Regions:
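Signature of N6-adenine DNA methyltransferases within the class I
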Residues: 1-172, 207, 273-285, 293, ...
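Proline-centric
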Residues: 22-27, 188-193, 198-208, 285-294, ...
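Short, flexible loop/turn elements at secondary-structure junctions
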Residues: 36-40, 66, 85-87, 186, ...
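A short, contiguous, amphipathic alpha-helix enriched in charged residues
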Residues: 51-59, 224-227, 304, 308
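Short, ligand-facing micro-motifs at secondary-structure edges
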Residues: 64, 262-280, 298, 306-317
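Conserved hydrophobic/aromatic beta-strand scaffold that supports enzyme active sites
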Residues: 78-82, 181, 262, 287, ...
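Polyanion-binding catalytic cores of nucleic-acid enzymes and NTP/SAM-utilizing transferases
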Residues: 122-286
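Non-catalytic DNA-recognition/assembly elements of restriction-modification systems
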Residues: 132-142, 153, 215, 222, ...
Length: 421
């Protein structure tokens, strides 16, 4: 396809090629409309198509249903795109139709870039311009963002508490390569729900000798041909890895053993967890490792990030798909260590409160079970106080983030109204 189409990309959905094909079939000044996925507006694979449209067409109208499920059976968000086979001039404008299909506004085609198609009225566009003038894209920070573990066969490599205990009982050495695991759906705002799942961490990069782990070897052998990495029917994808190893190399495995940020690939909310417990993650989540993480997570968990990321930087998808590519594009203001301290202190208080909430809830259950009413009342009051600390600190951070991006009172209203809507 790359030899035939200028919009080609190895990971692109097939509909991308129909845009170029349709344009080639049109007569000069001809019109064409599409109703299809909106993912190419912001996804990395759509960069060639975005550039192609900007260079070869005049956009007439776009309706972007980002975050709105128009077609019940569709697995991604949709869009209506109408363009003309004619190169746009510098002053060319097009109509952006709101999701209600009633309200609309004009936007200059020159305000779109091949990096991303983001549709905004002038006031919203002014906020985006502030974000990009004041902030530095995360890809330029001293951090790494990596995906979770792709095993190729989770039924074998992800185990429960009972299986973990049995393997360690048979061979204590098993504990060396059994790691606590979180999935994307376990991630909450500044928190997580550990469901007592574990990963057998036989990563190819470790070059393990499986005979040194007798219980795990015996356990994995019980899955037979399904663990083979030959690409044959009934086995895993073909790789050069050994039968007992995970599908992906996981060269960054040491990052799991550090403090880090964890977030879900697909979530209806933007929630980030600060991990100090050395959790490993499966392929449904990502990790951020590196420097300035507590300051960064304060921005990522803010209301401002939630609204602006999905409006301008996300890759579409009805479940709020978040990718490494799109997150790396989001600009965060770089400030010195002293200026970061107020953000970090508030995050530390939230993390401490979240941990106490976890510690107190079993005590409350015990008090209720034992009909210890005084204890029950005291614990409920303490839990309420801890929840209030989290809520209050999050609201304070929101206001600090507005100030960080130099938002006016009117711009703050736009941000908060977009969240309510």
């Amino acid at each position: 396809l790359s030899k035939i189409y200028k919009v080609a990309n190895g990971t692109a959905d097939l509909y991308v090629y129909f845009y170029e094909l349709a344009l080639n079939m049109l007569k000069p000044n001809g019109l064409k409309g599409f109703i299809c996925s909106n993912k190419f507006f912001r996804a990395k694979y759509g960069e060639n198509l975005r550039e192609y449209i900007l260079q070869n067409t005049t956009i007439l109208q776009i309706a972007d249903f980002n975050g709105v499920k128009i077609f019940e059976d569709a697995t991604v968000d949709s869009a209506i795109t109408i363009f003309q086979k004619q190169k746009a001039d510098n002053n060319s404008t097009f109509k952006v139709v709101d999701v209600d299909l009633i309200n609309s506004y004009l936007m200059k085609q020159s305000d779109l870039t091949k990096t991303s198609f983001s549709f905004s009225n002038p006031k919203e566009l002014a906020i985006k311009q502030k974000i990009e003038q004041i902030g530095t894209p995360l890809k330029e920070w001293d951090i790494n963002i990596n995906s979770g573990i792709k095993t190729g066969f989770n039924e074998a490599f992800i185990i429960d508490e009972a299986t973990k205990n049995e393997l360690i009982k048979k061979d204590p050495k098993s504990a060396e390569i059994i790691k606590p695991l979180l999935k994307g759906r376990d991630i909450k705002k500044y928190d997580c729900i550990f469901k007592e799942l574990y990963s057998i961490a036989t990563f190819p990069v470790l070059k393990l000798e499986i005979n040194n782990y007798t219980a795990i070897k015996e356990y994995l052998q019980s899955f037979g041909k399904r663990l083979e990495q030959t690409g044959e029917k009934g086995s895993r994808k073909k790789t050069t890895n050994k039968w007992f190893e995970t599908q992906d190399n996981i060269a960054y495995y040491k990052d799991f053993e550090q403090e880090k940020i964890i977030f879900s690939k697909a979530s209806k909310d933007t929630v980030f967890y600060y991990d100090k417990q050395h959790f490993y993650i499966d392929v449904t989540a990502y990790i951020i490792s590196g420097n300035n993480l507590k300051y960064i997570i304060s921005i990522l968990n803010s209301l401002f990030f939630k609204t602006q990321f999905y409006k301008f930087y996300s890759g579409g998808g009805i479940d709020g798909e978040m990718t490494i590519f799109t997150l790396k594009e989001f600009p965060i203001p770089k400030i010195d260590e002293e200026s970061q301290k107020p953000f970090i202190n508030l995050v530390d208080e939230i993390l401490e409160a979240k941990q106490k909430i976890k510690d107190y809830k079993p005590l409350l259950d015990e008090a209720i079970k034992n009909n210890n009413f005084d204890r029950e009342i005291a614990l409920k009051k303490e839990l309420e106080n801890l929840e209030n600390i989290c809520t209050t600190n999050e609201k304070i951070i929101d206001q600090m983030v507005y100030k960080l991006y130099d938002l006016t009172p009117d711009e703050i209203k736009i941000v908060e109204n977009s969240f309510r809507n």
